[in-house]
Curated annotation (Swiss-Prot):
Divinyl chlorophyll a B3 binds at residues 675, 683. It is found in: Cellular thylakoid membrane. It catalyses: reduced [plastocyanin] + hnu + oxidized [2Fe-2S]-[ferredoxin] = oxidized [plastocyanin] + reduced [2Fe-2S]-[ferredoxin]. This is Photosystem I P700 chlorophyll a apoprotein A2. PROSITE patterns: PHOTOSYSTEM_I_PSAAB. The PsaA/B heterodimer binds the P700 divinyl chlorophyll special pair and subsequent electron acceptors. PSI consists of a core antenna complex that captures photons, and an electron transfer chain that converts photonic excitation into a charge separation. The cyanobacterial PSI reaction center is composed of one copy each of PsaA,B,C,D,E,F,I,J,K,L,M and X, and forms trimeric complexes. GO terms for biological process: photosynthesis. SUPFAM superfamilies: Photosystem I subunits PsaA/PsaB. It comes from Prochlorococcus marinus (strain SARG / CCMP1375 / SS120). Divinyl chlorophyll a B1 binds at residue 667. The keyword Oxidoreductase applies. Its EC number is 1.97.1.12. It is a multi-pass membrane protein.
Amino acid sequence: MATKFPSFNQGLAQDPTTRRIWYGIATAHDFESHDGMTEEQLYQKLFATHFGHLAIIGLWVAGNLFHIAWQGNFEQWVTDPLHIRPIAHAIWDPHFGQGITDALTQAGATSPVNIAYSGLYHWWYTIGMRTNAQLFQGAIFLNILVCWLLFAGWLHLQPKFRPSLAWFKNAEAQLNHHLAVLFGFSSIAWTGHLVHVAIPESRGQHVGWDNWLSVLPHPQGLAPFFSLNWGAYAQNPDSLDAVFGTSQGAGTAIFTFLGGLHPQSESLWLTDIAHHHLAIGVMFIIAGHMYRNTFGIGHTLKEITEAHNTDNPNDPHTTAKDGRHFGVNHNGIFETVNNSLHFQLGLALASLGAACSLVAQHMGALPSYAFIARDYTTQSALYTHHQYIAMFLMVGAFSHGAIFFVRDYDPELNKGNVLARVLETKEALISHLSWVTMLLGFHTLGIYVHNDVVVAFGNPEKQILVEPVFAQAIQAFSGKVMYGINALLANANSSATLAANSMPGNHYWMDMINRQDALTNFLPIGPADFLVHHAIALGLHTTALILIKGALDARGSKLIPDKKDFGYAFPCDGPGRGGTCDSSAWDATYLAMFWALNTIAWITFYWHWKHLAIWQGNVAQFNESGTYLMGWFRDYLWLNSSQLINGYNPFGVNALSPWAWMFLFGHLIWATGFMFLISWRGYWQELIETLVWAHQRTPIANLVGWRDKPVALSIVQARLVGLTHFTVGNFVTFGAFVIASTSGKFG
């Protein structure tokens, strides 16, 4: 007889109800909970999944390359990137009538197509690709790589090729490998591509497989490198009248420090980018030789952490007022981190989340791809995309931090160290965060509501408008002169300015920072920015409060002292202990996700509206309407959704109709979430039992039976399903809104 799902949990496989299916899906990737799982097997399985993960990414990128080469207009687009709209792929749908077929036959295509808002065209163009054949070759190469990755994943699960537990826990070797090989060498390799292929192509010099060994990337070749005359590589950069992709204004420099933007492509100088990657690569290769491994030289992480202990009896930090000795503040930290995958994953997710949010900001403030800064819809889509991903990663960091406290934390090993002290002082941490959120919330909302009232009563001059003087000062210190704050780089005679002016060569940072359009990397800010900044701060601090409380209370609280024994996720256990709903560490993640979505919406609303106003030459709209809530609702949300609610109507359709339909459907998905979030298990169990009764008494329905007794989702599962609908609906609705409202104005 076939083994029932899930094979990894025989106890669950014997469950006679539909709970078997849902719990099986929920725990499929919780390898720690599987039958017969050892620590070594756990590490080996996770290692193998990395290859699968990389294979999925490779397939995804190959799919983009293949479909754009097959159905896109890449070769036409590169001839005029500013005016030809890039095509993502063709679309065919049996529901299409003549109206929508005509509306979506766009961008020079002969049949319905989707416009690309991914920025892939700009990326491939910038790195030197020019033909569909190159895109096809890239797709084929990646598919071959995917096959190798899948084979490698399978191979590393075979007994002879499974790495040992000691190999996984050799932190120093792992750090050296990741720093020097993965980060360092890949950065150097990317520098090589930029220098040998991308920079020559940007100067009208084709470099391909046919001539890459015979075309020198610099007239002097490697001579300046070996003679230590490295400055030669920075001499003769492209001129300010350089035309991207042609020899007009082209120089010979390959590593520069120009700053600012290429005037025609309005992107960072490729030679600056190459210099950046070279420096990053060298730094990481040095960093990858710092930790003790094969040769017995270098640091060990255990020594580094324990060197931070304050054992000196004269150290004021050593002894607390009550006489307790605090000198062992890092004892056990290395073992704790090195033996906890959840701790390591939490650190990785937090780091990657912060980096992803930084990418969102920098793709707009410091655009690195040629002409992408003028593709406003793509810029809006990429900002939104990266901020939403950053939100997920950062919430996940706290979630795995909480799982660490439940599953991996050892009180004896960590006695008296910083981890133990964080747990001891959690009430102070949580209550301070609570105080901060209340201060931010009451003050920010109070000012917004005050402004709404006075505007509604016809006295807009009575609004409370606070200039963000400290933020303006930071912009001025960095060189922005419009505020009249004469300090540092905004003062022509300051030591900072004189030092900057003494650097050899030309530099264009000040030109960029004082531009009058959206391409200045510091946009002018005023009272509307001040208010929304504090609204976002409220959202960030509230999200952090819920997540930090969830993690610090994950082992136990005054309400549930033995909470760790219940695991990471557990349902309410009724009124017996004063009601325990919303107290598991998983519930903290669940609750925080709503605040995280709230916050990320405010962040992307702010970025999008401010940029729309600048792009349309109507900066006053944001500055004047952004100081009260009705201004946001009326002049951003309502005004910009007009394109969406007119994508299709009784008089016909236009190219925005698919986004209009997605906008509507996104609202439906979002609203469906509340069905799971508001009505709980008992209602559904009673309904299911009634439906089963009706089914069994309907002769034709009895042709279909089931092995598992139908039961309602658990409270935790229903919350997950509800949150998923809420989140996906949020994405679909706002994604459609951003793309349609921006492309409806700018194409």
